[in-house]
């Protein structure tokens, strides 16, 4: 089994400007639905942890069931709006983190229904019913088509064009040269020329 202090997580942080419309930490908090396609060599129950940072950090878990090994299936989970803790930070601060739990030791597990928008004390990283994917030699886990939506309903995945995706990614990382060109410099008669390719305003402090 997984040791008491061992964790296997997929980590996804979000900035405040991406989440402030959820109005969490207020009486008007909205639900959040996460939908995705998943394929795992280890069937069973898995869990997703949502941590809401801000004034009074809070966390919640939702479980989903991988029914068959090595087969793609669509899943969705809905987190109720957090109206008591974790007022969203705005702008560039880390506001929310989604953890895809693939394994947690017994000291890091809790019942899904118990740990729902409570403070983050205890370092919980999985639910009691979750599989120990990390303890299976050669195990594989794949997700794609992840979509987060305001409200309790998951809709069809909204595809974006390649230029749109590139522009969004360049907020966090951008090559010093064009995408199709390897980074480097040119030298001519002692003159060294470099290029800084930054078409979009990059975030200076990645969460």
Predicted regions mapped to residue ranges:
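Extracellular and organelle-lumenal recognition/adhesion modules and their flexible linkers in secreted
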Residues: 1-207
